[in-house]
UniProtKB/Swiss-Prot annotation:
PANTHER family registered for this protein in UniProt: ARYL-ALCOHOL DEHYDROGENASE AAD16-RELATED (PTHR43364:SF15), NADH-SPECIFIC METHYLGLYOXAL REDUCTASE-RELATED (PTHR43364)
Name of the gene: AAD16
GO annotation, biological process: aldehyde metabolic process
Annotated source species: Saccharomyces cerevisiae (strain ATCC 204508 / S288c)
Name of the molecule in the record: Putative aryl-alcohol dehydrogenase AAD16
Role noted for this protein: Putative aryl-alcohol dehydrogenase.
Family recorded in the similarity comment: Belongs to the aldo/keto reductase family. Aldo/keto reductase 2 subfamily.
Highest taxon of source: Eukaryota
Induction: By cell wall stress and the YRR1 transcription factor.
Enzyme class: oxidoreductase
Length: 342
């Protein structure tokens, strides 16, 4: 068996899997009905990943209200896996309270708003407490802590100092960012540099054949400064993995489809999907393999949700898919600029 080779993340010494395992879909259906609850099934998928060489897990404290992090701990314990053989990434920003049944698309009453007022965002209070709670749920330190969104109410200096302090405290090894403008990322980075604090080694963003807005500023900035790129939803919530005439129940139940405007595709987006289908047939690979391969060809390490062992094998096979310049141009040609989604 050929194992997946690890790669360096950005300008750090940290080595990760070229494809990162997205753990948002492992947890509780109370959080989202498309989430997998069966731990036997989850552990089987995760162990298959591990045995093949995919050993980088991306989660967030918010996913299933903390349960996703606990599942990673339980997985490592169940198989007696050595901690140093895996990389654990998590995120902080959204509220987490395991005494509440917070939903993926949560709304809070006024009492919950009050209770959670300091359990969300990126204040020093929340970053330190949130990281300590994540470490408890994971049962170990965090390799890469990412700010899930930018908190526009907290001063950037406070954010970066708190992130620096959780690294120095030993809870976290590296820090990264997610889903923000290039100017915001740069200002945070320059703030850390000014004071000699730890800086981001990575950036997560929504990036795929249907949404390429970060090619304007964030991606060029990241590449210029050797920041690792970790696109989430590289298959556009599965839209790039099947022909236009096919659908799934998740489209109806996942509000992210609407916020990303995947519930009402533009004609050029439909054409891109048709072209992915055509090229995949010509190359005798699946549409998922092709769309993942495109992201890989862009120098990124995509975060992929994997709900079966077959999907794991499919994602790994994408590492062997090569695309010619003509094929890339053909896939990208219909794209038209869009407004910033996230």
């Amino acid at each position: 068996m050929v194992l997946v080779k690890q790669v360096r993340l950005g300008n750090s010494g940290l080595k990760i899997s070229p494809i990162v395992i997205g753990c948002m879909s492992y947890g509780s259906k109370k959080w989202a009905d498309w989430v997998i609850e069966d731990k036997t099934q989850i552990f089987k998928i995760m162990k298959h990943c591990y045995d093949k060489g995919l050993r980088t897990f991306d989660t967030a404290d918010f996913y299933s209200n903390g349960l996703s992090e606990r599942i990673i701990k339980e997985f490592l314990e169940y198989y007696s896996i050595k901690r140093e053989t895996v990389v654990i990434m998590t995120k902080i920003y959204f509220p987490v309270d395991e005494t509440l049944d917070l939903h993926h698309n949560f709304t809070l009453n006024e009492f919950e708003e009050l209770d959670l007022s300091n359990q969300r965002g990126l204040s020093r209070k929340h970053i330190i407490a949130g990281v300590e709670n994540s470490v408890k749920r994971l049962g170990t330190y965090i390799d890469l802590l990412q700010i899930h969104r930018l908190d526009h109410e907290t001063p950037m200096k406070e954010i970066m100092k708190a992130l620096n302090d959780v690294v120095e405290a030993g809870h976290v090894r590296y820090i990264g960012a997610s889903s923000m403008l290039a100017t915001e990322f740069a200002e945070l980075q320059f703030t850390a540099d000014k004071y000699g604090w730890f800086q981001f080694i990575s950036s997560q963003s929504y990036y795929n054949l249907l949404y390429r807005e970060d090619e304007r500023e964030l991606i060029p900035f990241a590449k210029r400064h050797n920041i690792g790129l970790l696109p989430w939803s590289p298959n556009a919530r599965g839209m790039l993995t099947r022909p236009l005439n096919q659908s799934t129940d998740r489209i109806k139940s996942d509000p992210t489809f609407k916020s990303l405007h995947l519930d009402n595709l533009e004609e050029e987006q439909k054409e891109i999907i048709n072209r992915v289908e055509k090229v995949s047939k010509d190359k005798k690979v699946s549409m998922a393999m092709l769309s993942i391969a495109w992201v890989l060809h862009k120098g990124c390490h995509p975060i992929v949700g994997l709900n079966t062992t077959a999907r794991v094998d499919e994602a790994i096979a994408a590492l062997q898919v090569t695309l010619t310049e003509e094929e890339i141009k053909y896939l990208e040609e219909p794209y038209k600029p869009q407004r910033q989604r996230c």
